[in-house]
Swiss-Prot record:
NCBIfam families: PRK00281.2-1 (NF001392), undec_PP_bacA (TIGR00753). It catalyses: di-trans,octa-cis-undecaprenyl diphosphate + H2O = di-trans,octa-cis-undecaprenyl phosphate + phosphate + H(+). The chain crosses the membrane at residues 95-115, 119-139, 152-172, 195-215, 227-247, 256-276. Pfam families: BacA. The gene is uppP1. Bacitracin is thought to be involved in the inhibition of peptidoglycan synthesis by sequestering undecaprenyl diphosphate, thereby reducing the pool of lipid carrier available. It is a multi-pass membrane protein. InterPro entries: UppP. This is Undecaprenyl-diphosphatase 1. The keyword Membrane applies. Belongs to the UppP family.
Amino acid sequence: MTDPATTMSWVQVIVLSVVQGLTEFLPVSSSGHLRIVSQLFWGEDAGASFTAVIQLGTELAVLVFFAKDIWRILTAWFAGLADKSKRNFDYRMGWMVIAGTIPVGLAGVLLKDLIRENFRNLWITATVLILFSLVFILAERRGKKTRGFEELTMKDAVLMGLWQCLALIPGVSRSGGTISGGLFLNLDREVATRFSFLLAIPAVLASGLFSLPDAFDPQAGQAASGLQLLVGSGIGFVVGYISIAWLLKFVSNHSFAWFAAYRIPLGLLVMALLGTGVMAA
């Protein structure tokens, strides 16, 4: 259990919210970065609950950025429920998002205590940052990247949903896990990225709402006021929206493995800081 801590300062809220917005959609692990920055500059963990709540801001960025896609999928899904003749690809996509969300939903509930306490050790975060970078490189090399968006199947959705479960460990990255899974399934890099965003919507939204009461409790990390959470979510929204646009443009003509070139040195740096006592795990 995290020891009771002081309330968060505004500087801390702003810095962590910018970090959240920048890293939530990049395959570098937002939870890992928040954990590292909190410990390095403030000497304590902001907490999994604070992280989950400010993710609601970045979640809103996804909803706005993909509003047309989401609306098309939702209307097709409801139309398909009412009329079998209207069951097109978007109708099936609705079911794929639901099916892909079930694994991480079950894992999140069953492993809640483990996620909030044991998994947040910085030695684990640093190690995973390095090891999962190798998965990125392997996914890029093994994946044929030939399958388009309309070639997605229910099997793909479930398998990518299982990959998303790995993101419960700080250092993996939600997008990193699901996109890697998509590449191993031979999906085009941009297709895997777009579906990764859609797949994250229910999971992140549920996680943020579920963690909202705990975000005010110092026992769950540092306590934040309602206004701080609101401002933090707003910052996360703006920075997150920019991050989404940049990532989709980047992956269209750049290897996913480039992120490993950032993650591996970061993991080694964190290990060095832990080993020398500059940071506590």
